Amino acid sequence: SLSEKNKAAVKALWSKIGKSSDAIGNDALSRMIVVYPQTKTYFSHWPEVTPGSPHIKAHGKKVMGGIALAVTKIDDLKTGLSELSEQHAYKLRVDPANFKTLNHCILVVISTMFPKEFTPEAHVSLDKFLSGVALALADRYR
C-alpha cells in the first residue's frame, strides 16, 4: 500500500510531468505494441495500429487521463477507479495482466523523458502507485 510519503512523491512528480501526459501516453502505448506485440489484438478494430498513429495518440491520451484521475483519487483508488474497472472488465474485456505491461512502459517513458525528476524515491513511489492502479482496475474482474 502507499504510504503518505509515497503519495506525496507521486503528487510531486505528477505536478512536474502532468503537462506532458499526452506525449507520455503516446510513447508508452507505442512502446507497448512494439515490445509486446500481442497487445495489438485489443486494438484490431483500428485501421492502423502503429507507433504514434492517431489512434495510439488518442488512446494514450485517454490512458494518461485515467492516470491523472487516479492521482486525484490516490487515497481510495478502488472506489475512485470503479467505473474504469467496470469498463475494462465488462465492455473492453482487457486481460488485467496488460495493466502491468503498460505500467512498465509508462515507467520507462517517464524515466527517459524526466531523468532528473525520476529519482529513486519517485521511481519506487510511482511503481507502487501504478501497481495500485492496476489492482483497482482489476477489481471488477472478480
Curated annotation (Swiss-Prot):
Red blood cells. Keywords: Acetylation, Heme, Iron, Metal-binding, Oxygen transport, Transport. Signal peptide: none annotated. Residues 1-142 form the Globin domain. One of its GO terms (biological process) is hydrogen peroxide catabolic process. Disulfide bonds: none annotated. Gene3D superfamilies: Globins. Heme b binds at H88. O2 binds at H59. GO terms for cellular component: blood microparticle; haptoglobin-hemoglobin complex; hemoglobin complex. GO terms for molecular function: haptoglobin binding; heme binding; iron ion binding; organic acid binding; oxygen binding; oxygen carrier activity; peroxidase activity. The modification N-acetylserine is found at S1. SUPFAM superfamilies: Globin-like (SSF46458). This fish has five hemoglobins: Hb C, Hb O, Hb 1, Hb 2 and Hb 3. Hb 0 presents the strongest Bohr effect while Hb 1 presents the weakest Bohr effect. Involved in oxygen transport from gills to the various peripheral tissues. Heterotetramer of two alpha chains and two beta chains. Belongs to the globin family. This is Hemoglobin subunit alpha. The gene is hba.
